[in-house]
A protein has these predicted regions:
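Electropositive phosphate-/nucleotide-binding environments in soluble metabolic enzymes
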Residues: 1, 21, 47, 63-66, ...
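NAD(P)+-binding Rossmann beta1-loop-alpha1 motif at the extreme N-terminus of oxidoreductases
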Residues: 1-39, 43-48, 75
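Rossmann-like NAD(P)(H) cofactor-binding subdomain of soluble oxidoreductases
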Residues: 40, 47-55, 59-129, 147
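Rossmann-fold dinucleotide-binding core
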Residues: 93-191
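Catalytic phosphate-donor-binding core of small-molecule kinases
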Residues: 128-133, 138-153, 158, 194, ...
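Active-site-proximal catalytic alpha-helix in oxidoreductases
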Residues: 130-136, 165-210, 221-241
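NAD(P)-dependent Rossmann-like dehydrogenase/reductase catalytic/cofactor-binding core
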Residues: 181-182, 210-220, 224-311
Length: 311
């Protein structure tokens, strides 16, 4: 919804799709989401009819939880036209297939007109029109140009790249890293310890990008360092906040209630990236440790020990 504000401010006609009739009725009635403080303009169409929303649309922005991208893109394929462009704003890895979202959509829709948009931005900052930057990854010049034309303005900067896999790795794994960074905060460690952890994580992410065929320079992009720094240092990040609750030693009930009432993409991605690393025989000890803390209930204090002993 925050991204919709950019397109709207750039004089684009906006249609929003949801699969929930209740959500549609609530948004139409209140013209506001309970998730972010954004007054939805009255001329933005809100519908549960995907055909209606996709018809005569130039750019289709995919901004839904990663686990629904597969089923949603299969439905989208019924109405997609070859001259349309898909802009992926969702982040994550599908658990069963271990595929990134670009590949999932490519498998379901026969088009190269797909871009991945990613960067260090929070929804409220987008809505408040402060200067922000995005990386836009696509192999299609047409796709990059049409999305940039619709999004760039005097407060939104777009940098182009062809490194789709590197952009998706950064956007996905940063949510997992943010959980661990929040744990350090929850245990009472200062920002100095967090920056040590973030720096070590950047080295590991860069190595993963290279191992999966991406461009290691992507780590220095808006989608890389920019998004990782933001997500790993702010309580506005849901993933960071979850980690902080764990680090503070909150009860299982309190933690589970937070998870139940909040979208935590880092948890979903943690299981996916763990499986991906195993399948590809790639070593990334920091992911194994975060997994052990969250799933196998190891003490969060193992994080600092790991950082000191890490080669």
């Amino acid at each position: 919804m925050a991204l919709a504000s950019i397109f709207y401010n750039n004089k684009c006609n906006i249609k929003m799709w949801t699969n929930s009739e209740d959500e549609k009725d609530m948004l139409i009635k209140n013209r506001k989401s309970d998730k972010i403080n954004y007054n939805i303009p009255s001329d933005i169409i809100i519908s549960t009819d995907m055909k209606e929303v996709v018809l005569n649309t130039d750019i289709i922005v995919v901004a839904i939880p990663a686990k629904f991208v597969g089923s949603t893109s299969k439905e989208l394929n019924k109405y997609f036209k070859s001259n349309q462009v898909i802009c992926i704003a969702s982040k994550g890895i599908e658990q069963n297939s271990c595929l990134f979202l670009y590949d999932i959509i490519r498998n379901n829709i026969d088009t190269l007109n797909i871009g991945v948009i990613s960067g260090g931005t929070f929804a409220e900052d987008i809505i408040n029109m402060v200067p922000i930057g995005f990386s836009l990854a696509s192999r299609s010049n047409y796709t990059r140009n049409i999305i940039t034309k619709a999004m760039a303005n005097d407060y939104v900067k777009i940098r182009h790249t062809r490194d789709i896999i590197g952009t998706e790795i950064c956007g996905s794994i940063k949510n997992v890293i943010a959980i661990a960074s929040g744990m350090l905060d929850g245990m009472g460690y200062p920002i100095s310890t967090s920056t040590m952890f973030i720096t070590e994580s950047l080295h590991d992410i860069k190595a993963l990008i290279k191992a999966l065929g991406g461009n290691k320079k992507t780590i220095l992009s808006f989608a890389g360092f920019g998004d990782i720094l933001l997500t790993c240092t702010s309580t506005k990040s849901r993933n960071y906040t979850l980690g902080k609750l764990i680090g503070e030693g909150k009860s299982k009930e309190e933690i589970n209630n937070y998870i139940k009432n909040t979208t935590i993409e880092g948890l979903y991605t943690l299981y996916s990236i763990k499986k991906l690393l195993r399948n590809k025989k790639i070593k990334m000890p920091i992911i194994n440790l975060i997994y052990d803390i969250i799933v196998n209930e190891k003490e969060p204090s193992n994080l600092t020990k790991f950082l000191i002993e890490k080669e």
